[in-house]
Amino acid sequence: MNKSLLTLSLIPIASVMHTYGTNHVPDNRPNIILFLVDDMGWQDTSLPFWTQRTMYNERYETPNMEKLAQQGMMFTQAYASSISSPTRCSLMTGCNASRHRVTNWTLRKNTKTDAVSNTLEVPDWNYNGIAQVHGTNNTFIATSFVQLLKDNGYHTIHCGKAHWGAIDTPGESPYHFGFETNIAGHAAGGPATYLSERNYGYDEAGNSTSLFSVPGLEKYWRTGTFMTEALTQEALKALDKAKKYNQPFYLYMSHYAIHVPIDKDVRFYDKYKKKGLSDKEAAYASLIEGMDKSLGDIMDWLEKNGEADNTIVIFMSDNGGYATGSGWRDEPLYTQNFPLKCGKGSAYEGGIREPMIVRWPSTVQPGT
C-alpha cells in the first residue's frame, strides 16, 4: 500500500491509542469506523475525486459519499495496492506490502495465486497471509491494530470481507486479530453470490457449494435480501449491542461489494437501465448504490444514537476499479478508469488509485 496513504489512514487510530495511554484518560474517546469497499474505482461515484466531473461521476448516484465528503476531507490522490489482500494486510499491520510480502491474493494454504509466466520468475512471497502467532510458513507475523484497540478498552466489530490469511491458517479468522464480533468474515476474497435466493452460496441442506460461500447469514436465506443489505442490518445490530457496553467501538465495515460476481441489486437496477446502461453496467451501478445506501444507514445510526460527533469515519477502497473481465464489464476493457490506464491488478494508476474520505468532527475541517 502507498506509504503516505497508510500513514494518513492510521493517524486517527494512533492518536486514540496515545490519548488512552496517558494518566488523564478522557471519557469521550472516539469511536472509529473503517468503511472499506471492495474493488471500487476512483470514479465509481457521483463524487468527483478530480478537478472536474467525469462521465462516470454523472452515471452513478452516491449521495451519502457526497454527504460524508461535505462533513470531512477528500483525498483526491489516494492509493492502495493493486489487489485486495496486500492492502488489507497493510491496514491491519501498518506495514507496506514490500515489508509484509503478501503481494497477491490469498486463498488456499501453501498455494500461490500467481499467474503462470514463461518470462517472469515470481519470488517467494507470504501466500499464507498474516497472523499474530508463529507456526505457519510463508506468513508475516505482526500484532494487529485491532488487537491494540481491544486491549485498550475498545469493543471491536468485523462485518463483511476479511481476506488476510489462507484457509486453515490462523489468519483466516477475524477473531484471531482481536475482533470480538465477526459477521460473515472468512478466508475467501469474494462472494459466491450476493443473492439470498441462492443462500449466498449454500445449498438447501446448508452445505457450502464454493470456497466463496459467505458464512453466517443463514437468517437471510430466501428472504430476498441482497447481501449488502444483510451485512448492513447485521452491522447495525452489532452497533446497537455495542452501545450498551459503555465503551468506544471500532467497526470494520468491509463490504464484499463491488467485487464480482456483479449481481443485480434489484433495489436500484431498473433506475440505471432507464438511464440507458447495458445489463452489465446497470448491475455494476446498482452494486455501487447499494454500498452507498449502507454508508448512509450507518451514518444515520450515528446521528440517531448521538455518536456522530464522537466518531471517526474513514472511507476507502482496497484497490482500483475492476476493468479486466468482459463477463462483468462492457468492452472496451481497461477503459473503465479512464483517463487512468487499466484497473484492478495493474500497477498502472487505474489499478491503484482509489476514493478516500475521512470525517473526524472538530479535528478534520469539513469540506476540504
Where would I find each of the regions flagged by the language model?
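Formylglycine-dependent sulfatase
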Residues: 2, 9, 20-368
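Bacterial N-terminal signal peptides
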Residues: 7-15
